[in-house]
A protein has these predicted regions:
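N-terminal glycine-rich phosphate/pyrophosphate-binding loops that anchor nucleotide-derived ligands
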Residues: 33-75
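Short amphipathic, charge-patterned alpha-helical segments
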Residues: 105-107, 257-274
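Hydrophobic alpha-helical positions that pack around
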Residues: 130-256, 272-274, 432, 459, ...
Length: 483
């Protein structure tokens, strides 16, 4: 068994309650942090080599050091708990099982940043997790870990948990800030970065749930000890959400540096393939990263062993590599259709695009429509080249990375599995005869409705609703005037 930093006590009965969590050393890092200089905490995080666990992998200590301390404006820490990436569910698991560890991490990190008002922004669909966190925060207030003059230190901190409305785009830090301010969740143009102009125009740091939950261990044990775990610049442990055609799906905490083959095939982790079918492909970091075929999953293009690290997973660039991303590890056996998988992802990104940038708004729509045609036996060879052209025009031409996230899976699928796309063109009748196509006639209807200008019909419905609201409001005011 590897080192456990976050999940060491996860199976302790009632660990979600304050009393049990405190008995296991909970909130000790807050006591220690209150006696340390804030800059010393930041330096320990820098020494640790901790990288953001939300997907980008940016060094956390460096991100903290960017925060504006000269303006004199209030600073904020925001926890990004808007976990919406298909294939990723580790943050939900952490918040369900260890809510007080997140609260402790928020307090310790806020001390380091000298923030006095911090927020946890949680995904709209996680309402039960919202209630779990709210209870943990109330227990922290009741026991003197939040509020005025925490433990007689003179340090004040208020912590709030806020629920989003279910928009994937709000996982992007500036869109999250916009939503937290009560606005539409559209990403901002950067610069200025949130570390300078963030929440309410104040310096703000946005970190992922897992990132923040690593901080108490670093404060208690030191950055150097954390850096000893892992390999190279990939230090510490990482939570992986394993799913797909494997025997043991679930959330696993691994030491960065184990081999991908060990993670997939070992009984300690994924347990190998279901019914011992051949491995076909894997999405190693959530739906937004390039898919890897079986021949590039365990070995790199240089015939080196591929490791569960940021560097090894990206070896060869997107031509022969991928990203560890958010840790959404989806495994496919030989029964899975890559064209169908690509269509599913394209449909998701089209639905979740905020529409602010034309390349993303229009491009994701075309990606969905063209992949729909190919998946359902209505495509032609030109459609494959059209997909390639569309994704190239999206990538790098949008305000936020959602456009890139929509383009990369399509590019990788065509690069590694073009023969499957061509099969869908050459044998449309075989594609149409598949059971999953017959079971979903609504998808054909939906596609036809889109071609028949469904957006215009929806606009007319919204206009009608608006007119009804105006009429009812006028009627109510007229009644008040009469009486």
């Amino acid at each position: 068994m590897g080192k456990k930093i976050l999940l060491e006590h996860v199976n302790v009965p009632n660990i979600h309650t304050y009393e049990v969590y405190r008995s296991k050393g909970g909130y000790d890092s807050v006591e220690k942090a209150l006696k340390m200089a804030p800059n010393d905490i930041v330096e320990e995080v820098k020494k640790s080599g901790l990288r953001g666990r939300g997907g980008a992998g940016f060094p956390t200590g460096m991100k903290w050091s960017f925060i504006d301390k000269k303006s004199g404006r209030p600073r904020h820490l925001v926890c990004n708990a808007d976990e919406s990436e298909p294939g990723t569910f580790k943050d939900r698991y952490l918040m369900e099982k260890l809510p007080h560890l997140l609260v402790e991490g928020m307090i310790t990190s806020s001390i380091a940043l000298e923030a006095h008002l911090s927020y946890i922004y949680i995904r709209g669909e996680y309402m039960w997790v919202y209630r779990i966190l709210e209870r943990a925060i109330n227990e922290a207030y009741a026991n003197g870990w939040l509020g005025k003059n925490i433990k007689g230190s003179g340090y004040d901190l208020d912590l709030h948990v806020t629920c989003g409305a279910g928009a994937y785009i709000c996982g992007e830090e500036t869109a999250l800030i916009e939503s937290l301010e009560g606005k539409r969740g559209n990403p901002r143009i950067k610069p200025p970065f949130p570390a300078v102009v963030g929440l309410y125009g104040n310096p703000t740091v946005v970190n992922n749930v897992e990132t923040i939950m690593d901080i108490p261990w670093i404060v208690m044990n030191g950055g150097d000890e954390f850096a000893k775990i892992g390999i190279g610049k990939s230090t510490g442990t990482k939570l992986i959400s394993a799913s797909g055609n494997i025997k043991n799906p679930g959330v696993y905490e691994i030491e960065l540096g184990i081999t991908v083959e060990e993670f997939v095939m070992s009984d300690e982790w994924c347990g190998g393939m279901q019914t011992d079918r051949p491995l076909k492909a894997c999405v190693p970091g959530g739906s937004s990263v390039p898919i890897l075929p079986a021949n590039l999953l365990f070995k790199t293009a240089k015939d080196e062993t591929r490791l569960m690290t940021y560097e090894s997973m990206a070896d060869g660039g997107f031509a022969t590599g991928s990203m560890i991303g958010s840790g959404g590890f989806i495994v496919y056996d030989d029964r899975q259709c890559i064209v169908r998988n690509t269509w599913n992802f394209s449909r998701f990104y089209h639905h979740e695009s905020c529409g602010q940038c034309s390349p993303c708004r229009e491009g994701t729509g075309w990606l969905e429509k063209v992949t729909w045609r190919l998946e359902h036996g209505y495509g032609n060879m030109e459609d494959i080249d059209l997909l390639w052209d569309i994704q190239r025009k999206i990538e790098g031409n949008t305000i936020c990375p959602l456009g890139d996230a929509a383009a990369w899976p399509v590019a990788a699928a065509i690069r590694h599995f073009r023969h499957e796309f061509e099969y869908h063109v050459r044998y449309p009748e075989k594609v149409k005869d598949r059971k999953h196509f017959e079971a979903e006639p609504w998808e054909k209807v939906k596609h036809l409705m889109e071609l028949l200008y469904l957006p215009i019909l929806l606009d007319l419905v919204v206009l009608a609703q608006f007119c009804i609201m105006l009429f009812l409001n006028y009627k109510q005011k007229l009644c008040l005037f009469m009486f």
